[in-house]
């Protein structure tokens, strides 16, 4: 795997987190372990009708691949969007999307995350699965400025939070999206199209709680053609359940609502590249 820092530097965060790694068996069953060993995440591809067991190391504070990850992978595989393409995974976490893109035939895969633990986890997971991936640490598109990609994948933090102040807790930063859930989403919409190659595509997954129609509108304003490609309704997870009362008070969900709709939004760049309006 190509990487921008030494193996020892990349792996250092895993050494400190070695006694708190989780073992994940599917989306809803989690067991704790004090041994450093890979997590096991099960992703079901509806496009192929098969279940692929993928072992992913997940240190504390790194986002655990979940239903939103699976939905985005399903869309990517069903559309054949990764095969033969240069792929960028923004906010890679454990590297689940980067791995899926490589397995789906991408010619080159780049992964970016601000978290050093996420970068370390992605580096190790790609080594485990013998996948070639260039890994960068940095803020969204900053490490790959000036480059162009045929496919950009993003599963950003999108859960509405009590404040726009960045949480001191590492794990909260995996899902906190600011007061309206769009702190990172809006940046993806404005900055992402500029990194798309002609005829390139960006796929973003997020909850309808932060309004997929706003995402479509912002992407269209950035000079690409946006549409919702897929939807899936799932029960609230632990974070959404804890914040349900706050979301109800803000009118973001209906009283008593305890499920959410996930949406995958596609942004299509024209043959000449994005056109700024």
PLM features per residue range, with description:
Residues 10, 16-17, 28:
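Short hydrophobic alpha-helical segments enriched in small aliphatic residues
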Residues 141-152:
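A short acidic, Gly/Pro-enriched loop at the edge of an enzyme's catalytic core
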Residues 156-184:
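Mobile active-site "lid"/loop adjacent to the S-adenosyl-L-methionine
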Residues 38, 42-104, 115, 121, ...:
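SAM-dependent Rossmann-like transferase core, predominantly class I methyltransferases
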Residues 108-113:
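Conserved SAM-binding motif I beta-strand of class I
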Residues 130-140:
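Conserved SAM-binding strand-loop segment of SAM-dependent methyltransferases
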Residues 182-240:
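Conserved Class I SAM-dependent methyltransferase catalytic core
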